[in-house]
Design a protein with these regions (language model features):
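Bacterial N-terminal signal peptides that target proteins for export
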Residues: 2-20
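Short, low-complexity disordered leader/linker segments with a strong preference
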Residues: 5, 32-36
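Polar helix-capping/helix-linker motif
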Residues: 8-10, 29, 189
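Short linear sequence elements within intrinsically disordered, low-complexity coil regions
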Residues: 9-12, 23, 32, 343
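Bacterial N-terminal signal peptides
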Residues: 18-30
Length: 355
């Protein structure tokens, strides 16, 4: 099933088609065969990819086998599609965007269709992308009418002199450059509406009000990091933000250095979690800096920041990271993180909980 055909259907039909497609694909999840990698024989840089669909309070007790299969189905589809593009020689930024667009098209994840609601019942979307070779980056924040926020972030990176555009200005720029515009209701889902109602009820029960909500509504992001045949590493992130957010709140996802960062001399990182902490501790860039200036391995740098720095600060979440050799790290300090990867040998990994 082509996930992008879903876009042309009315909301109810689109969601029904997605559910059928996801269920059909779920039967192939339990054992994912390795993908042949011919890059070594061809003398090219081996390629690799890692993706995430958000971290947070993902309790096994509330996860049915059918629902888990649906999540893993979309993760598998996305990571294999991105890997196939890399094998064909596509640039890293193309693979990142096309991979994330699959996740943005799924109502399961908090990005694009399926994005959470603001306090006022709308969707405000953020995304960013960064190229580790050129250090070019692009981001959009608080957009409501752009079909694919990650595509808009790529447009900002490639075609504008800026790094970040926000709100109506970002929407106008995307429209002028031919990106698809949609009504904000395209991103509606009943599941997220119920989450908004629960968040509002919780906020009314505590004296601190706004910002006091706990649970899954604090989390939710999608992202991808890749190593392409040119030896470049690229990172991208897209999100609907925090459920019941107000006042134009922007999290870490569109902030270069916090939710997204890439440097060929160290690593590429896409983050997910409690965004305020990721901004304050500059999480994505910190991981890369520990590799570049302290000589830490990718795994040590990522684990130190996620499971030491963030934990001590009180920040929950995780990251996916990749270095110029194709090593992948996917640490998280929450109950779970939707994630998948294909390494330089073509080995596929799809997981939700701790190994």
């Amino acid at each position: 099933m082509n996930p992008f055909r879903i876009f042309r259907q009315p909301n109810k039909v689109r969601h029904a088609l997605y559910a059928i497609g996801a269920l059909a694909a779920s039967f192939a999840i339990t054992s994912v065969p390795a993908i042949a990698d011919d890059s070594k024989q061809l003398g090219k840089t081996p390629v690799a990819i890692a993706i995430h669909g958000g971290a947070g309070t993902i309790l096994k007790s509330s996860m049915t086998p059918e629902k888990e299969a649906d999540y893993k189905s979309v993760l598998t589809q996305a990571v294999q599609h991105g890997y196939a593009l890399l094998q064909k020689g596509e640039k890293g930024e193309v693979a990142v965007v096309e991979t994330i667009k699959i996740l943005e098209s799924s109502p399961l994840f908090n990005a694009g269709i399926g994005a959470v609601y603001t306090f006022d019942g709308e969707h405000e979307l953020d995304a960013s992308i960064m190229h580790g070779g050129s250090k070019n980056a692009g981001a959009v924040a608080g957009v409501k009418t752009i079909r694919s926020p990650i595509e808009a972030a790529l447009l900002v990176m490639n075609e504008s002199p800026h790094v970040m555009l926000s709100g109506r200005g970002a929407e106008d720029y995307a429209k002028e450059n031919g990106l698809e515009q949609v009504d904000n209701t395209v991103f509606d889902t009943e599941f997220r509406k119920q989450a908004l109602d629960k968040a509002k009820a919780r906020m009314q029960q505590v004296s601190s009000g706004y910002g006091s909500q706990q649970g899954n509504e604090r989390f939710g992001t999608v992202g991808a990091v890749v190593l392409d045949q040119g030896g470049n590493i690229v990172a991208g992130t897209s999100t609907g933000g925090m459920t019941a957010k107000r006042y134009g709140r922007i999290g870490d996802s569109p902030v270069i250095g916090a939710g997204t960062y890439a440097d060929n001399e160290s690593c590429a990182v896409s983050a997910t979690g409690h965004g305020e902490y990721f901004i304050r501790y500059n999480v994505a860039a910190d991981i890369c800096a520990r590799m570049k200036y302290q000589g830490l391995t990718l795994n040590d740098a990522a684990n130190t920041v996620v499971n030491d720095v963030l934990v001590k600060a009180g920040g929950d979440g995780g990251v996916i990271a990749i270095d110029a050799k194709g090593n992948v790290a996917m640490p998280f300090n929450s109950a779970g993180m939707y994630r998948a990867s294909v390494d330089i040998n073509g080995k596929v990994k799809v997981a939700i909980y701790k190994d």
